[in-house]
Regions:
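Alpha-helical transmembrane segments of multi-pass membrane transport proteins
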Residues: 1-331
Length: 331
């Protein structure tokens, strides 16, 4: 499933679909304070749903939305924060690549993980939008409204929204809808999504050999990176387990006589700190297997624990001193 989801995301990115969506939503939301920030967050949410790749979302929106926001007079710090936070939604909103990897490591159902992640992901997106609108309402200078002469007629705005939003929404429903309805497995839905991305590219007349070739190359490159991380991390985890590391950790946590909530707080602090210097792949494959036996010991719902980790990693990717999303934006 991972290579197919990656291919779908890269093809959607190369096809220019996201650019059309951003500018259409920006026009539709022109009456709201911080309309471009709202458009950027909605686009990040939809693009995350279509790809599940943090780096791709932040990088593309950095090239697409950030220059437009700065040119419109937006505060640079405000614009950067909007793009970084919106881009990190890809770690949580299905079909998140991270959740697929987590399901393999923890032997959990990817369907149930996706179902559990939808509400937190959309809730965070809604909170980000609420923050952006409120902040711009309180301090209009950080997000000036667009000039009235730049706004086209309503009929033209409606046409742009329909042309850009409906096809992408159909692709999202093809992927997520079939998974959540139990019609297809994640791998089958990913294959359907990849084929749907090809159809969308043809529909928008951007299905060029160069775009297709770049998407295949980036898919192979990213998949190879993830697989090598898997190999190294699984090797470490196997040796760690063979030498009794899991038993040492379990004995330590059980001997200090802590409650379930204290265990959750300790583990989330550890995950948060690890999110500064490490990518999510290393954290999941090396450290999560250490915590999984303890999750069962303390009687924590494994899907609840997975959501805590996903939310935590998203937060840590926004937090200095590392702030990986900021590095993606700067690059």
């Amino acid at each position: 499933a991972v290579p197919l989801f990656l291919f779908m995301g890269y093809l959607v990115e190369r096809a220019g679909i996201v650019a059309k969506l951003f500018f259409a939503i920006r026009l539709a939301a022109h009456r709201l304070p911080a309309s471009m920030a709202v458009a950027a967050l909605i686009t990040c949410t939809l693009f995350s749903t279509a790809t599940g790749i943090i780096g791709a979302v932040v990088t593309l929106m950095g090239l697409l939305a950030w220059p437009a926001m700065v040119k419109a007079g937006y505060d640079k710090k405000f614009a950067s924060g909007i793009i970084c936070s919106g881009g990190c939604l890809g770690i949580l909103i299905p079909p998140s690549i991270m959740l697929i990897v987590y399901s393999v490591i923890a032997q959990l159902s990817p369907l149930r993980l996706f179902a559990a992640a939808i509400f937190p992901g959309l809730m965070l997106a809604g909170l980000y939008i609420t923050y952006a609108v409120t902040r711009a309402w309180l301090n209009p200078s950080i997000a000036p409204r667009p000039p009235a002469e730049d706004i086209p007629p309503r009929a033209e705005i409606l046409k742009e929204v329909l042309v850009s939003f409906v096809p992408l929404f159909g692709l999202i429903m093809l992927v997520l809808g079939t998974i959540l309805a139990g019609i297809a497995t994640p791998a089958e839905a990913a294959a359907a999504g990849a084929f749907g991305a090809i159809i969308l590219s043809w529909f928008y007349k951007t299905l060029k050999w160069q775009n297709f070739k770049e998407s295949v190359f980036l898919t192979a490159k990213t998949t190879a990176m993830i697989m090598w991380l898997f190999i190294g991390s699984w090797t470490f985890s196997s040796v760690f387990s063979y030498l009794g590391g899991h038993e040492v950790f379990e004995h330590f946590f059980t001997s200090i006589n802590i409650s379930t909530w204290q265990f959750l707080v300790i583990t989330q602090i550890i995950i948060f700190l690890l999110g500064w210097p490490l990518e999510w792949t290393e954290i999941l494959i090396i450290f999560v297997p250490i915590f999984l036996p303890l999750v069962e010991f303390f009687g924590v719902n494994p899907y609840f624990f997975a959501m805590l980790i996903a939310l935590n990693l998203q937060t840590s990717f926004l937090t200095p001193p590392m702030a990986m999303s900021a590095y993606y934006l700067k690059g």
